[in-house]
Curated annotation (Swiss-Prot):
Record lineage: Bacteria, Bacillati, Mycoplasmatota, Mycoplasmoidales, Mycoplasmoidaceae
GO molecular function term, any single one: magnesium ion binding
Job description of the protein: Catalyzes the reversible conversion of 2-phosphoglycerate (2-PG) into phosphoenolpyruvate (PEP). It is essential for the degradation of carbohydrates via glycolysis.
Co-factor binding comment: Binds a second Mg(2+) ion via substrate during catalysis.
A biological process term (GO) from this entry: glycolytic process
Residues annotated to bind (2R)-2-phosphoglycerate: 168, 351, 380-381, 402
UniProt subcellular location: Cytoplasm; Secreted; Cell surface
Recorded superkingdom: Bacteria
Family classification: Belongs to the enolase family.
Catalytic residues (UniProt): 210, 351
Protein name: Enolase
Amino acid sequence: MKIINLLAYQILDSRGQPTVAVKLFLENDQSVIAMVPSGASTGAKEALELRDGDVNYFFNKSVKLAIQNINNIIRPHLINKNVLNFFELDNLLINLDGTENKSKLGANALLGVSIAIVKAGAIAASKPLYQYIKEDLMHNYDVNYYAPIPLMNFINGGAHADNDLDIQEFMIVPLNAISFSQAIQIGSEIFHQLDKLLKSNHLSTTKGDEGGFAPMLKNNYVTLELLVHAIKKAHYLPSKTQGVCLALDVAASELYENGKYFFKKSSSHNITLEQTSFSSDEWIKYWSKLVSMFPIISIEDCFEENDWNSFALFLKNNPHIQVVGDDLYCTNLKYLQKGIDFKATNAILIKPNQIGTISETLDVIKFAQKNNINTIISHRSGETEDTFIADLAIGVGAGQIKTGSLSRSERIAKYNRILEIEQELKDKLIYEPSKFFKFR
């Protein structure tokens, strides 16, 4: 089926900042829309998100140039092309840009088109998007699918919230569920108990960028204790082996300066009872201690994005948890290979906009899975209502998804899409934490 037109235009993300939307038209009068997310704490290795730098138009944040690149440069090369030739078309996008970091046309331009081609391909193949991804792009024809375990961000800090918490995400992980819908039920019940606990302690229930609460709390210990309390109040067991677990995204590159790690936000207000400055060795001991004290099953970016040795040592000392690389890898095959050589992590966060095309994203996922590295499909803090990553998570069999809290419609949309897929697949959609957390 042929592409007959392509139109890019500017929309707003969940932070009210401009981003790219792409509408692709097929010869059967059907069309699809793809919307591109944007991050706040970004890794230095990420592909370039092209913005205009015009102080008089959206204060430097406009994406007019990326849109012009789609409409004027990319579009003519795609008209009348067969949308089912996905890898050929994606390779065309990569070659049109011709740079390693997508700096000519912009990763936000390429990704919008790449996602639109995948969505349109599913229509042309008369398949649900997740099935098209699995069969036609991953070449996996197993009749069963795996539901992603949700890592739900209930307390926001760092660059995602205007509070005194340096750690970016405090998440709950319902490993005790037997289905995705039950995992969402468990998460919702804990989320609302947390809301009650915050109110009873006269703490703010305002939300951060990803829909989690953003209260002023003294330190990480207090925050983790609060989450454990909320789990218990919802009548669940906080446990790494048979209950509800915790997960963290430290975003440590934001806390690293001149060879040391610092809790910057909390120490500036003198509210922390913790040490605030750490060498790499002290930082390893700090997180190892937290893991021993709380039911933490997963820690993401606990070291600066070039501190490969510390990642490797931490994983060696803590083999029974998931150590995740995000800024460490930036969904880039070259860096993932380095991480495998270092034995730096046992999991990778997958963000398509870090690399710029879906074909390259799939290459990273396939390579990770081949090397027994867990894959976690992730949103960005600046999101849209596009639910593509929900289908992607199921289509590639990622096993885990990070798409925020149980509030804010751009986050809920992804959860609701997976619930919809669960209704379609019924018992063919398997929720199996033991498959993806074998190291427990």
